[in-house]
């Protein structure tokens, strides 16, 4: 059995950006951890082909989209599409930590396979055809 898995540790103390994509050897989408110091803002920018999703992990982000500010708190997400200008800003007195994900092209859809347990052999089945396992005993 070939195993294709990578692991890394997020560093919330990083100066500006941790390029997680490289650390995990990802090719199909980008993922970056971004830390904005109080009062810091990034460049106004756009992407030609990729959607970008921002997930706020800590603090309050002001995401400016085509000149309109949108405030996002912890556990809130925003998507900005290709060709749309955006700027990430932190007008607060606390740092902001964001996970940014970007991808171009179309989503592959449901390409998952599932097994009942680790001992099951074969190519796997559609996930909806495999019942969820019982909860772990507490």
Regions found by a protein language model. Give the residues of each.
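A short, N-terminal "cap"/entry segment at the start of jelly-roll beta-barrel domains
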Residues: 1-29, 43, 109-138
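Short histidine-centered beta-strand/loop micro-motifs
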Residues: 21-23, 42-48, 89-91
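Short strand-coil-strand connectors
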Residues: 27, 64-68
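Short, conserved beta-strand element in jelly-roll/cupin
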Residues: 33-37, 46-64, 101-104
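A generic "binding-loop/recognition-motif" signal
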Residues: 38, 49-50, 68, 84-85, ...
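Ligand-binding loop in jelly-roll beta-barrel domains
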Residues: 62, 82-110
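Short acidic-glycine-tyrosine-enriched beta hairpin
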Residues: 67-83
């Amino acid at each position: 059995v070939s195993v294709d898995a990578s692991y890394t540790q997020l560093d919330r103390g990083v100066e500006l950006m941790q390029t997680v994509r490289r650390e995990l050897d990802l090719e199909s989408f980008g993922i970056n951890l971004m830390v904005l110091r109080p009062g810091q803002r990034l460049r106004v920018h756009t992407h030609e082909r990729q959607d970008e999703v921002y997930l706020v992990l800590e603090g309050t982000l002001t995401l400016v989209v085509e000149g309109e500010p949108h405030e996002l708190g912890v556990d809130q997400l925003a998507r900005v599409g290709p060709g749309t200008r955006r700027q990430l800003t932190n007008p607060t007195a606390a740092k902001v930590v964001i996970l940014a994900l970007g991808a171009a092209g179309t989503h592959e859809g449901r390409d998952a396979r599932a097994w009942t347990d680790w001992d099951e052999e074969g190519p796997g089945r559609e996930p909806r055809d495999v019942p969820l396992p019982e909860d772990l005993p507490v």
